[in-house]
Curated annotation (Swiss-Prot):
CDD domains: RRM1_I_PABPs, RRM2_I_PABPs, RRM3_I_PABPs, RRM4_I_PABPs. Interacts with eIF-iso4G. Interacts with ERD15/CID1 and CID7. Interacts with Turnip mosaic virus (TuMV) VPg-Pro and RNA-dependent RNA polymerase (RdRp). It comes from Arabidopsis thaliana. SUPFAM superfamilies: PABC (PABP) domain, RNA-binding domain, RBD. One of its GO terms (biological process) is regulation of translational initiation. Expressed in all organs (at the protein level) but under distinct spatial and temporal regulation within each organ. This is Polyadenylate-binding protein 2.
Amino acid sequence: MAQVQLQGQTPNGSTAAVTSAPATSGGATATQFGNTSLYVGDLDFNVTDSQLFDAFGQMGTVVTVRVCRDLVTRRSLGYGYVNFTNPQDAARAIQELNYIPLYGKPIRVMYSHRDPSVRRSGAGNIFIKNLDESIDHKALHDTFSSFGNIVSCKVAVDSSGQSKGYGFVQYANEESAQKAIEKLNGMLLNDKQVYVGPFLRRQERDSTANKTKFTNVYVKNLAESTTDDDLKNAFGEYGKITSAVVMKDGEGKSKGFGFVNFENADDAARAVESLNGHKFDDKEWYVGRAQKKSERETELRVRYEQNLKEAADKFQSSNLYVKNLDPSISDEKLKEIFSPFGTVTSSKVMRDPNGTSKGSGFVAFATPEEATEAMSQLSGKMIESKPLYVAIAQRKEDRRVRLQAQFSQVRPVAMQPSVGPRMPVYPPGGPGIGQQMFYGQAPPAMIPPQPGYGYQQQLVPGMRPGGGPVPSFFMPMVQPQQQRPGGGRRPGGIQHSQQQNPMMQQQMHPRGRMFRYPQGRGGSGDVPPYDMGNNMPLTIGALASNLSNATPEQQRTMLGEVLYPLVEQVEAESAAKVTGMLLEMDQTEVLHLLESPEALKAKVAEAMDVLRSVAAGGATEQLASLNLS
């Protein structure tokens, strides 16, 4: 018997020996796989890369070794990989080191298959249960190796290393697996009869299980006085019973349920049919097929989700989501606002743990027609100096699905490093217009507005219905001399091009006036826009009124004029991109941002997170999860 001594450093610094076992004829050969990469499992958590290199280095020339670790804690995951220069050395390592203790713990060595389909196919994989506790990986391998080349072999163990009584063996081909099943199923291993059969995933086991053929019966709603003998007497007349037990707690009291196992499945089925609903000691029994815990949990979860969905579908069109509420509005006040449009079954203002209003709430009507009428009449209406946002309430999951569907075709926006002057992109007429450079329609990556996700033209009373074409985007070029070293602009001194956009000259404002922000603004984000005609601050209400008389393109431009300077105060470098993202929100939401510095800062921060994620890759996923409304 060949003995190979592998000397290496133990985790505590002492020297440990790894003693090899004789090579088995059932080991997989290198010529079969032509593989130089090995998987090493069941490693001690203290084994390092260098110690793994020392153990396998005696088998041949090792190219690389790696112990896999948790990304956060850097703790070993208990497995690693070893790469040799030639297949012969890898085959020798499998034959001589498989199941050999490495620093006190037997390791498993097998070929590494990078193609996951090979590992997950289940071909040649068998399941063994009712194993004696003394049978370990090596004993199981030695037992099954005579039927063919074994790819992997494992006995399931708990956290303390004790066998759970079952294991798995995967052969290189299906023929070897079938041969092992035929020869060993029902045989005695260490005086215990074992079951050997094809491996089935849990989903496959559940789907292939014949729920009409069962022998184990579940009984509940038992009286406290019901005993095991009572169950035997009640069920015994339907067939031969192998066991009957009433489940008890630690104090010996009945838990109110039990199990009866029949020898014949037909007898069990007749007992269920006859005794389900039977009264015993004034208790009506429930009798049915005994289920596994996982099966029962799955069934209950499916039933719960179905009931939840049915309830949501029933009230979906009757439940309204209300946003941009004044902090002074209570549940009663919210109900009073919506009551003129129908029967309000419930109204709720959402609050934080301190009782402060979150500015949003829900109103449920008796019928969908009443909810639709309330939404059409109150969307954009000024309540306590704030325009309401009213829409059909959506579940979070449904909203995410809609966002994913909307942005599934959006291509990532590449964030290039800034060179020279900043060139923001937003609709014509934006602040700081220099020489206008038109580039036609916005590219797909600009996230064009779509019905139901962009601005809603009827959120402000009198706003024109229908959506026009996507507005053209342009890049206003800010002159270098107007740029501060820190990326900001000097107050004033911005030269407009001699030829303005005709729409800008004639239709920008109903009274022919432009908006501007006061010079020398500070860090606050709630400075109201100015009407240049009167040099007086333009209130949100007046802005909403002006928006109601403008076309969709003009509305977007007007809001961009007002929003851009506020965004620039919070995020100067990406102000244009962030402004464009915020303008995709509903009109009332943008108006809310204009008067709420805290809300604006939160949305800007959210937009910047998305832009950074897009720059790092995974744009579609980030855009799909973006929720700026």
